[in-house]
Amino acid sequence: MRALIKSGATVMLFCVLEDSGAKTRAAKVWKLRFEAFNANVRKIAGEVGAILLDPNQESSWRHPGFIHEDRLHLNSLGHYRVAQAVLARLNLPHDSSWRTPLPPPVKLPLGEQIKTNLRWIILYGIPWAIRRIRKKSSGDGRSPKYPAPTTWKP
C-alpha cells in the first residue's frame, strides 16, 4: 500500500459497519470484532495517508434496506450507496441524494419474522456452518472476474 501511495495512486480504505442496529447476542460479538478491525484500518489510513470511508460516522448506513437477505452482504441499493459515498469522498460527480434516509423498515408480524429467520437458517446459516466445519470458503474454486489489473476510465 505504501508503494502504491508513493507511486501517486489514490488509495482508499474502508471500515466496516460496527453496529447494524440489531440487538442480538451475535450482533454484540460482531460489534466488538468490527471495532477492533476498524481501529486498525483507521490507524493504517492515518499512517499512510489513505482516504478513509467510514460508514460508522453516518447512522443512515444502519438501515436493513441496504443488506442482502443473507444478512452479510450489501444488496443492490447498498452497493449503489457505497459507490456514491466513494465518489463523494473522492470529490467526483455523484448522486447527492445518496445520504437521504430510507423510510423506517416495516415491522413484520411475529409469524413472518419466524418464517424469515427459518428461511435464513436453511439457506444461509446451515450452509455457512457446514463450510466452516469443512474449512471451505464460498469462494473456493471461483475464478476472479478480472484476473489482471484493470484500468477504469472515469
Segments the model singles out, each with a brief description of its role:
Residues 2, 39-43, 88:
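Surface-exposed alpha-helical segments enriched in charged/polar residues
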Residues 1-4, 75:
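Short alpha-helix in the Rossmann-fold core of NAD(P)-dependent oxidoreductases
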Residues 19-55, 76:
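Substrate-gating cap/lid alpha-helix
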Residues 59-69:
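The feature captures the short pre-catalytic strand/loop hairpin that immediately precedes
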Residues 5-11, 50:
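A short helix->loop->beta-strand "cap" motif at the edges of active sites that frequently abuts
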Residues 14-15:
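Alpha/beta-hydrolase-fold catalytic nucleophile elbow
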Residues 47, 70-73, 77-154:
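Conserved catalytic region of serine esterases and O-acyltransferases that act on ester linkages
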Residues 18-19, 125:
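Oxyanion-hole/transition-state-stabilizing segment in secreted/luminal serine hydrolases
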